[in-house]
Protein backbone atom coordinates (compact mmCIF):
# COMPACT_ATOMS: atom_id res chain seq x y z
CA UNK A 1 0.00 0.00 0.00
CA UNK A 2 1.08 3.58 -0.65
CA UNK A 3 0.60 6.60 1.61
CA UNK A 4 -1.43 9.79 1.63
CA UNK A 5 0.32 13.04 2.44
CA UNK A 6 -1.20 16.27 3.71
CA UNK A 7 0.52 19.39 2.39
CA UNK A 8 -0.03 22.46 4.59
CA UNK A 9 -0.01 25.89 2.95
CA UNK A 10 2.96 28.20 3.40
CA UNK A 11 3.18 30.62 6.31
CA UNK A 12 5.35 33.71 5.85
CA UNK A 13 6.08 36.21 3.11
CA UNK A 14 5.97 36.14 -0.68
CA UNK A 15 9.60 37.01 -1.40
CA UNK A 16 12.37 34.70 -2.61
CA UNK A 17 12.04 31.65 -4.86
CA UNK A 18 9.64 28.78 -4.23
CA UNK A 19 11.17 25.41 -3.27
CA UNK A 20 9.61 22.02 -2.52
CA UNK A 21 11.43 19.00 -1.08
CA UNK A 22 8.41 16.67 -1.45
CA UNK A 23 8.27 13.69 0.95
CA UNK A 24 10.69 11.15 2.45
CA UNK A 25 10.61 8.40 5.06
CA UNK A 26 11.74 10.80 7.74
CA UNK A 27 13.86 13.76 8.84
CA UNK A 28 17.22 13.10 10.50
CA UNK A 29 18.66 16.57 11.11
CA UNK A 30 17.70 20.23 10.81
CA UNK A 31 20.21 23.10 10.65
CA UNK A 32 19.06 26.71 11.14
CA UNK A 33 21.03 29.94 10.68
CA UNK A 34 20.01 33.47 11.64
CA UNK A 35 21.14 37.09 11.73
CA UNK A 36 19.95 39.87 14.05
CA UNK A 37 16.50 40.08 12.47
CA UNK A 38 15.44 36.81 10.85
CA UNK A 39 16.03 33.17 9.95
CA UNK A 40 18.52 33.34 7.08
CA UNK A 41 19.24 29.66 6.40
CA UNK A 42 17.69 26.21 6.77
CA UNK A 43 19.05 22.78 5.88
CA UNK A 44 17.38 19.37 6.11
CA UNK A 45 18.78 15.84 6.16
CA UNK A 46 16.11 13.41 4.98
CA UNK A 47 16.13 9.60 4.86
CA UNK A 48 14.70 7.79 1.82
CA UNK A 49 12.99 4.37 1.86
CA UNK A 50 16.24 2.68 0.86
CA UNK A 51 18.10 4.37 3.74
CA UNK A 52 19.94 6.85 1.54
CA UNK A 53 20.36 10.34 3.03
CA UNK A 54 19.32 13.37 0.94
CA UNK A 55 20.32 16.91 1.92
CA UNK A 56 18.63 20.16 0.89
CA UNK A 57 19.42 23.73 1.94
CA UNK A 58 17.99 27.21 1.36
CA UNK A 59 18.84 30.82 2.16
CA UNK A 60 22.32 32.12 3.02
CA UNK A 61 24.71 31.23 5.84
CA UNK A 62 25.87 34.40 7.63
CA UNK A 63 26.94 32.58 10.79
CA UNK A 64 27.57 28.95 11.70
CA UNK A 65 24.10 27.32 11.67
CA UNK A 66 22.81 25.50 14.75
CA UNK A 67 21.96 21.79 14.54
CA UNK A 68 18.96 19.85 15.84
CA UNK A 69 19.36 16.05 15.63
CA UNK A 70 16.32 13.74 15.51
CA UNK A 71 16.96 10.16 16.68
CA UNK A 72 15.68 8.60 13.46
CA UNK A 73 14.00 6.08 13.07
CA UNK A 74 12.74 5.98 16.68
CA UNK A 75 11.94 9.70 16.81
CA UNK A 76 10.32 12.07 14.33
CA UNK A 77 9.17 15.69 14.09
CA UNK A 78 5.44 16.12 14.85
CA UNK A 79 5.11 19.91 15.00
CA UNK A 80 6.77 23.15 13.94
CA UNK A 81 6.05 26.46 15.66
CA UNK A 82 7.29 29.77 14.35
CA UNK A 83 6.67 33.39 13.55
CA UNK A 84 7.03 35.72 10.59
CA UNK A 85 7.35 39.48 10.45
CA UNK A 86 8.42 42.34 8.19
CA UNK A 87 11.89 43.53 9.18
CA UNK A 88 13.83 46.65 8.27
CA UNK A 89 14.73 47.22 4.60
CA UNK A 90 12.84 44.10 3.45
CA UNK A 91 9.65 44.58 1.41
CA UNK A 92 7.90 41.36 2.45
CA UNK A 93 7.63 39.29 5.62
CA UNK A 94 10.25 36.68 6.49
CA UNK A 95 10.46 33.84 9.00
CA UNK A 96 11.75 35.23 12.32
CA UNK A 97 11.61 32.19 14.63
CA UNK A 98 11.29 28.38 14.53
CA UNK A 99 10.89 25.58 17.08
CA UNK A 100 10.67 21.87 16.18
CA UNK A 101 8.83 19.36 18.42
CA UNK A 102 9.36 15.60 18.31
CA UNK A 103 7.46 12.41 19.12
CA UNK A 104 9.70 11.93 22.18
CA UNK A 105 8.45 15.17 23.75
CA UNK A 106 11.65 17.04 22.95
CA UNK A 107 11.88 20.60 21.63
CA UNK A 108 14.63 22.12 19.55
CA UNK A 109 16.23 25.35 20.74
CA UNK A 110 14.32 28.51 19.83
CA UNK A 111 15.91 29.45 16.50
CA UNK A 112 15.80 33.11 15.51
CA UNK A 113 16.31 36.47 17.24
CA UNK A 114 14.50 36.67 20.58
CA UNK A 115 14.62 38.47 23.91
CA UNK A 116 14.54 35.97 26.78
CA UNK A 117 12.47 33.60 24.68
CA UNK A 118 10.02 36.25 23.47
CA UNK A 119 9.61 36.61 19.70
CA UNK A 120 7.82 39.17 17.55
CA UNK A 121 5.54 38.77 14.56
CA UNK A 122 2.61 36.62 13.47
CA UNK A 123 2.79 33.18 15.07
CA UNK A 124 1.99 29.90 13.26
CA UNK A 125 1.86 26.19 14.17
CA UNK A 126 2.07 23.15 11.89
CA UNK A 127 0.59 20.16 13.75
CA UNK A 128 -1.82 17.29 13.02
CA UNK A 129 -2.60 15.19 16.11
CA UNK A 130 0.84 13.64 16.42
CA UNK A 131 1.22 12.86 12.72
CA UNK A 132 4.77 12.62 11.38
CA UNK A 133 6.32 15.42 9.31
CA UNK A 134 8.10 13.89 6.29
CA UNK A 135 8.97 16.90 4.15
CA UNK A 136 9.12 20.67 3.88
CA UNK A 137 8.43 23.31 1.23
CA UNK A 138 8.78 27.07 1.27
CA UNK A 139 10.27 30.22 -0.22
CA UNK A 140 13.82 31.51 0.19
CA UNK A 141 16.28 34.03 -1.20
CA UNK A 142 18.74 35.80 1.08
CA UNK A 143 16.66 34.48 3.97
CA UNK A 144 13.87 31.98 4.64
CA UNK A 145 10.75 33.82 3.51
CA UNK A 146 8.07 31.17 4.11
CA UNK A 147 7.71 27.59 5.32
CA UNK A 148 5.23 24.73 4.94
CA UNK A 149 5.24 21.02 5.79
CA UNK A 150 4.07 17.59 4.63
CA UNK A 151 2.41 15.16 7.08
CA UNK A 152 2.06 11.46 6.33
CA UNK A 153 -1.51 10.26 6.92
CA UNK A 154 -3.18 6.97 5.96
CA UNK A 155 -2.26 4.18 3.58
CA UNK A 156 -3.90 4.37 0.14
CA UNK A 157 -3.83 2.21 -3.03
CA UNK A 158 -1.49 4.77 -4.64
CA UNK A 159 0.52 7.79 -3.41
CA UNK A 160 -1.84 10.69 -2.74
CA UNK A 161 -1.28 14.31 -1.70
CA UNK A 162 -3.96 16.35 0.06
CA UNK A 163 -3.21 20.07 -0.31
CA UNK A 164 -4.88 22.16 2.40
CA UNK A 165 -7.80 24.39 1.44
CA UNK A 166 -6.93 28.07 1.14
CA UNK A 167 -9.22 31.10 1.13
CA UNK A 168 -11.81 32.06 3.73
CA UNK A 169 -12.23 30.46 7.15
CA UNK A 170 -16.05 30.53 7.25
CA UNK A 171 -18.57 28.26 5.56
CA UNK A 172 -19.30 24.53 5.68
CA UNK A 173 -16.48 22.06 5.14
CA UNK A 174 -16.87 19.71 2.16
CA UNK A 175 -14.63 16.99 0.77
CA UNK A 176 -15.20 15.12 -2.49
CA UNK A 177 -12.33 12.68 -1.84
CA UNK A 178 -10.12 11.34 -4.63
CA UNK A 179 -11.00 9.70 -7.97
CA UNK A 180 -9.37 8.29 -11.09
CA UNK A 181 -9.73 11.62 -12.85
CA UNK A 182 -11.83 14.68 -13.73
CA UNK A 183 -13.94 14.88 -16.88
CA UNK A 184 -15.82 18.21 -16.65
CA UNK A 185 -15.93 21.37 -14.53
CA UNK A 186 -18.94 23.72 -14.31
CA UNK A 187 -18.39 27.06 -12.63
CA UNK A 188 -20.62 30.06 -11.90
CA UNK A 189 -19.82 33.53 -10.58
CA UNK A 190 -21.54 36.72 -9.51
CA UNK A 191 -20.07 40.21 -9.79
CA UNK A 192 -17.30 39.59 -7.25
CA UNK A 193 -16.64 35.89 -6.52
CA UNK A 194 -16.92 32.24 -7.57
CA UNK A 195 -20.36 31.13 -6.39
CA UNK A 196 -20.59 27.55 -7.69
CA UNK A 197 -18.32 24.61 -8.49
CA UNK A 198 -19.55 21.37 -10.04
CA UNK A 199 -17.11 18.55 -10.81
CA UNK A 200 -17.77 15.43 -12.85
CA UNK A 201 -15.35 12.73 -11.70
CA UNK A 202 -14.71 9.20 -12.91
CA UNK A 203 -13.82 6.18 -10.77
CA UNK A 204 -13.61 2.57 -11.97
CA UNK A 205 -15.41 3.51 -15.19
CA UNK A 206 -18.37 5.20 -13.45
CA UNK A 207 -19.12 8.93 -13.40
CA UNK A 208 -19.95 10.84 -10.22
CA UNK A 209 -20.92 14.52 -9.99
CA UNK A 210 -20.35 16.69 -6.89
CA UNK A 211 -21.47 20.33 -6.57
CA UNK A 212 -20.87 23.11 -4.07
CA UNK A 213 -22.02 26.68 -3.50
CA UNK A 214 -25.09 28.29 -5.08
CA UNK A 215 -25.87 27.36 -8.69
CA UNK A 216 -26.89 30.13 -11.07
CA UNK A 217 -28.80 29.91 -14.33
CA UNK A 218 -25.91 29.43 -16.76
CA UNK A 219 -22.69 28.01 -15.29
CA UNK A 220 -19.70 27.96 -17.64
CA UNK A 221 -18.30 24.56 -18.61
CA UNK A 222 -14.73 23.35 -19.05
CA UNK A 223 -14.45 19.86 -20.59
CA UNK A 224 -11.22 17.89 -20.33
CA UNK A 225 -10.12 15.22 -22.81
CA UNK A 226 -10.18 12.51 -20.13
CA UNK A 227 -8.31 10.16 -19.79
CA UNK A 228 -5.60 11.69 -21.99
CA UNK A 229 -5.85 15.17 -20.42
CA UNK A 230 -5.71 16.11 -16.75
CA UNK A 231 -5.45 19.23 -14.58
CA UNK A 232 -1.86 20.03 -13.59
CA UNK A 233 -2.52 23.08 -11.42
CA UNK A 234 -5.12 25.55 -10.18
CA UNK A 235 -4.21 29.20 -9.69
CA UNK A 236 -6.71 31.05 -7.50
CA UNK A 237 -7.34 34.33 -5.70
CA UNK A 238 -9.52 35.17 -2.70
CA UNK A 239 -10.69 38.23 -0.76
CA UNK A 240 -13.64 39.58 1.24
CA UNK A 241 -15.90 41.23 -1.37
CA UNK A 242 -17.89 43.33 1.15
CA UNK A 243 -18.60 43.60 4.86
CA UNK A 244 -21.72 41.44 4.58
CA UNK A 245 -20.07 38.47 2.85
CA UNK A 246 -17.57 35.78 3.80
CA UNK A 247 -14.06 35.86 2.37
CA UNK A 248 -14.43 33.83 -0.82
CA UNK A 249 -12.61 32.57 -3.91
CA UNK A 250 -12.64 35.35 -6.53
CA UNK A 251 -10.95 33.60 -9.47
CA UNK A 252 -9.88 30.17 -10.70
CA UNK A 253 -7.44 29.37 -13.49
CA UNK A 254 -6.93 25.74 -14.54
CA UNK A 255 -3.85 24.50 -16.43
CA UNK A 256 -4.02 21.10 -18.13
CA UNK A 257 -1.46 18.55 -19.31
CA UNK A 258 -2.19 19.61 -22.90
CA UNK A 259 -1.12 23.20 -22.15
CA UNK A 260 -4.71 24.51 -22.18
CA UNK A 261 -5.88 27.09 -19.63
CA UNK A 262 -9.37 28.15 -18.53
CA UNK A 263 -10.06 31.22 -16.38
CA UNK A 264 -13.14 32.06 -14.32
CA UNK A 265 -13.95 35.04 -12.08
CA UNK A 266 -12.04 38.22 -11.25
CA UNK A 267 -8.29 38.30 -10.66
CA UNK A 268 -8.37 40.27 -7.39
CA UNK A 269 -7.19 39.48 -3.88
CA UNK A 270 -4.50 37.21 -2.49
CA UNK A 271 -3.15 34.54 -4.84
CA UNK A 272 -2.40 30.87 -4.16
CA UNK A 273 -1.59 27.85 -6.34
CA UNK A 274 -2.68 24.23 -5.93
CA UNK A 275 -0.03 22.09 -7.60
CA UNK A 276 2.07 19.03 -6.88
CA UNK A 277 4.89 18.65 -9.40
CA UNK A 278 4.67 15.50 -11.49
CA UNK A 279 1.12 14.71 -10.31
CA UNK A 280 -2.44 15.32 -11.53
CA UNK A 281 -5.49 16.71 -9.76
CA UNK A 282 -7.90 13.92 -8.75
CA UNK A 283 -10.29 15.59 -6.30
CA UNK A 284 -11.35 18.79 -4.54
CA UNK A 285 -12.26 19.81 -1.00
CA UNK A 286 -12.96 23.16 0.62
CA UNK A 287 -15.57 25.37 2.31
CA UNK A 288 -18.87 26.68 0.95
CA UNK A 289 -21.77 28.94 1.81
CA UNK A 290 -23.48 31.13 -0.78
CA UNK A 291 -20.17 30.93 -2.66
CA UNK A 292 -16.97 28.88 -2.71
CA UNK A 293 -15.20 30.21 0.38
CA UNK A 294 -12.04 28.06 0.24
CA UNK A 295 -10.54 25.43 -2.05
CA UNK A 296 -8.05 22.60 -1.68
CA UNK A 297 -7.21 19.59 -3.83
CA UNK A 298 -6.02 16.00 -4.00
CA UNK A 299 -3.16 15.11 -6.35
CA UNK A 300 -2.32 11.59 -7.48
CA UNK A 301 0.29 10.03 -9.79
CA UNK A 302 0.11 10.52 -13.54
CA UNK A 303 -0.60 7.14 -15.19
CA UNK A 304 2.35 6.00 -17.25
CA UNK A 305 1.27 4.10 -20.35
CA UNK A 306 3.16 0.87 -20.82
CA UNK A 307 5.56 1.58 -23.68
CA UNK A 308 5.43 -0.74 -26.67
CA UNK A 309 9.22 -0.74 -26.58
CA UNK A 310 10.75 -1.45 -23.14
CA UNK A 311 12.69 1.50 -21.75
CA UNK A 312 15.90 1.41 -19.74
CA UNK A 313 16.95 4.02 -17.18
CA UNK A 314 20.67 4.81 -17.02
CA UNK A 315 21.75 6.02 -13.54
CA UNK A 316 22.26 9.73 -12.96
CA UNK A 317 25.87 10.93 -12.90
CA UNK A 318 27.20 13.80 -10.76
CA UNK A 319 26.67 14.82 -7.13
CA UNK A 320 24.17 13.46 -4.60
CA UNK A 321 22.46 16.65 -3.45
CA UNK A 322 19.25 18.57 -4.10
CA UNK A 323 15.75 17.41 -4.98
CA UNK A 324 15.41 14.22 -7.02
CA UNK A 325 13.42 14.63 -10.24
CA UNK A 326 12.27 12.38 -13.09
CA UNK A 327 10.48 13.65 -16.20
CA UNK A 328 9.26 10.15 -17.14
CA UNK A 329 9.28 8.38 -20.52
CA UNK A 330 8.17 9.86 -23.86
CA UNK A 331 8.49 9.16 -27.57
CA UNK A 332 11.42 11.53 -27.99
CA UNK A 333 13.06 14.86 -27.13
CA UNK A 334 12.23 17.98 -29.18
CA UNK A 335 13.87 20.88 -27.33
CA UNK A 336 16.56 21.34 -24.67
CA UNK A 337 17.06 24.46 -22.53
CA UNK A 338 20.31 24.86 -20.57
CA UNK A 339 21.09 27.75 -18.22
CA UNK A 340 24.58 28.46 -16.90
CA UNK A 341 25.72 30.10 -13.68
CA UNK A 342 29.13 31.34 -12.65
CA UNK A 343 30.49 27.86 -11.98
CA UNK A 344 28.41 25.37 -13.94
CA UNK A 345 25.01 24.34 -15.23
CA UNK A 346 22.32 25.96 -13.08
CA UNK A 347 19.17 25.02 -15.00
CA UNK A 348 17.78 22.46 -17.46
CA UNK A 349 14.36 21.97 -19.03
CA UNK A 350 13.28 19.53 -21.73
CA UNK A 351 10.37 19.47 -24.16
CA UNK A 352 9.26 16.01 -25.23
CA UNK A 353 7.06 14.50 -27.95
CA UNK A 354 4.25 12.09 -27.04
CA UNK A 355 2.22 10.97 -30.03
CA UNK A 356 1.17 14.20 -31.75
CA UNK A 357 1.59 16.31 -28.60
CA UNK A 358 4.50 18.38 -27.32
CA UNK A 359 4.88 17.94 -23.56
CA UNK A 360 6.98 20.47 -21.61
CA UNK A 361 8.92 19.01 -18.71
CA UNK A 362 9.35 20.82 -15.40
CA UNK A 363 12.11 23.33 -14.65
CA UNK A 364 15.10 21.80 -12.85
CA UNK A 365 17.57 24.06 -11.05
CA UNK A 366 17.39 27.84 -11.14
CA UNK A 367 17.82 30.30 -13.99
CA UNK A 368 20.44 33.00 -13.50
CA UNK A 369 20.64 36.43 -15.10
CA UNK A 370 22.42 34.72 -18.00
CA UNK A 371 19.12 33.08 -19.01
CA UNK A 372 18.99 29.81 -20.95
CA UNK A 373 20.22 28.64 -24.35
CA UNK A 374 18.19 26.38 -26.66
CA UNK A 375 18.99 23.29 -28.70
CA UNK A 376 16.02 22.38 -30.93
CA UNK A 377 15.76 19.03 -32.71
CA UNK A 378 14.35 18.86 -36.24
CA UNK A 379 11.80 16.43 -37.66
CA UNK A 380 13.41 13.01 -38.07
CA UNK A 381 16.15 13.85 -35.57
CA UNK A 382 16.54 12.08 -32.24
CA UNK A 383 18.90 12.34 -29.28
CA UNK A 384 21.46 9.55 -28.95
CA UNK A 385 24.04 10.64 -26.41
CA UNK A 386 25.05 13.22 -23.78
CA UNK A 387 28.63 14.08 -22.96
CA UNK A 388 29.48 16.25 -20.00
CA UNK A 389 31.63 17.07 -17.00
CA UNK A 390 30.95 17.33 -13.28
CA UNK A 391 33.14 18.88 -10.60
CA UNK A 392 33.14 20.21 -7.03
CA UNK A 393 32.96 23.98 -6.71
CA UNK A 394 33.55 26.33 -3.81
CA UNK A 395 30.66 26.57 -1.35
CA UNK A 396 28.85 23.40 -2.50
CA UNK A 397 29.43 20.08 -0.70
CA UNK A 398 28.55 17.75 -3.58
CA UNK A 399 29.73 17.98 -7.22
CA UNK A 400 27.60 19.76 -9.81
CA UNK A 401 27.26 19.42 -13.57
CA UNK A 402 29.62 21.96 -15.17
CA UNK A 403 29.17 21.12 -18.87
CA UNK A 404 26.67 19.37 -21.16
CA UNK A 405 26.83 18.55 -24.87
CA UNK A 406 24.11 16.71 -26.81
CA UNK A 407 24.59 14.38 -29.80
CA UNK A 408 21.82 13.41 -32.23
CA UNK A 409 21.67 11.10 -35.24
CA UNK A 410 22.49 14.18 -37.38
CA UNK A 411 24.74 16.58 -35.42
CA UNK A 412 26.20 17.79 -32.12
CA UNK A 413 25.14 20.76 -30.03
CA UNK A 414 27.60 23.35 -28.81
CA UNK A 415 29.03 22.55 -25.35
CA UNK A 416 27.04 24.30 -22.62
CA UNK A 417 29.66 25.10 -19.96
CA UNK A 418 33.37 24.44 -19.40
CA UNK A 419 35.15 21.10 -19.90
CA UNK A 420 36.70 20.70 -16.45
CA UNK A 421 36.45 17.99 -13.79
CA UNK A 422 35.38 14.41 -14.46
CA UNK A 423 34.05 13.55 -17.91
CA UNK A 424 31.01 11.32 -18.42
CA UNK A 425 28.92 10.01 -21.31
CA UNK A 426 25.31 8.80 -21.24
CA UNK A 427 23.80 6.68 -23.99
CA UNK A 428 24.02 3.24 -25.60
CA UNK A 429 24.67 2.13 -29.15
CA UNK A 430 21.44 1.53 -31.06
CA UNK A 431 19.30 3.45 -28.54
CA UNK A 432 17.75 6.92 -28.34
CA UNK A 433 17.07 9.12 -25.30
CA UNK A 434 13.37 9.50 -24.39
CA UNK A 435 13.54 10.99 -20.88
CA UNK A 436 15.75 12.63 -18.27
CA UNK A 437 16.11 12.40 -14.50
CA UNK A 438 18.55 13.69 -11.88
CA UNK A 439 18.98 15.94 -8.85
CA UNK A 440 18.92 19.74 -8.62
CA UNK A 441 18.81 22.62 -6.16
CA UNK A 442 19.86 26.10 -7.34
CA UNK A 443 22.22 24.17 -9.64
CA UNK A 444 22.06 20.85 -11.48
CA UNK A 445 23.89 18.27 -9.35
CA UNK A 446 23.34 15.16 -11.47
CA UNK A 447 21.69 14.02 -14.68
CA UNK A 448 20.63 10.66 -16.08
CA UNK A 449 18.67 9.44 -19.10
CA UNK A 450 16.01 6.92 -20.08
CA UNK A 451 16.61 5.15 -23.41
CA UNK A 452 14.76 2.85 -25.80
CA UNK A 453 16.00 0.86 -28.82
CA UNK A 454 15.90 2.70 -32.15
CA UNK A 455 13.29 1.09 -34.41
CA UNK A 456 13.82 0.37 -38.10
CA UNK A 457 11.27 3.07 -39.02
CA UNK A 458 13.41 5.83 -37.49
Swiss-Prot record:
It comes from Arabidopsis thaliana (Mouse-ear cress). GO terms for molecular function: carbohydrate binding. SMART domains: Jacalin (SM00915). Transmembrane segments: none annotated. Disruption phenotype: Larger PYK10 complexes. Pfam families: Jacalin. Keywords: Lectin, Repeat. Belongs to the jacalin lectin family. Component of the PYK10 complex, at least composed of PYK10/BGLU23, BGLU21, BGLU22, JAL22, JAL23, PBP1/JAL30, PBP2/JAL31, JAL32, JAL33, JAL34, JAL35, GLL22 and GLL23. Inhibitor-type lectin that may regulate the correct polymerization and activation of BGLU23/PYK10 upon tissue damage. Residues 5-153, 160-301, 311-453 form the Jacalin-type lectin domain. PROSITE patterns: JACALIN_LECTIN. InterPro entries: Jacalin-like_lectin_dom, Jacalin-like_lectin_dom_plant, Jacalin-like_lectin_dom_sf. Gene3D superfamilies: Jacalin-like lectin domain. SUPFAM superfamilies: Mannose-binding lectins. This is Jacalin-related lectin 22.
Amino acid sequence: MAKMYRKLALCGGEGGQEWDDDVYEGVRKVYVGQDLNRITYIKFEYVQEDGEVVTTEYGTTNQHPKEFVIQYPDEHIIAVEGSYHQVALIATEVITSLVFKTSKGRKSPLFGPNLLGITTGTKFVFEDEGKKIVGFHGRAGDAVDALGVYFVLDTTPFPLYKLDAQGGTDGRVWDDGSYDGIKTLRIDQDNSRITYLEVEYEKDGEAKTCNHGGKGDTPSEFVLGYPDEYIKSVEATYQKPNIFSNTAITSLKFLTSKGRTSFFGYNVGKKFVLEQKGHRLVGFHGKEDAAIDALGAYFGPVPTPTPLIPSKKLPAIGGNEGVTWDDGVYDGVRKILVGQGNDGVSFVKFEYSKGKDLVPGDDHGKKTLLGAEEFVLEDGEYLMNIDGYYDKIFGVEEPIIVCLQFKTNKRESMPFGMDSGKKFSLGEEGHKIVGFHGQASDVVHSIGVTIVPITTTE
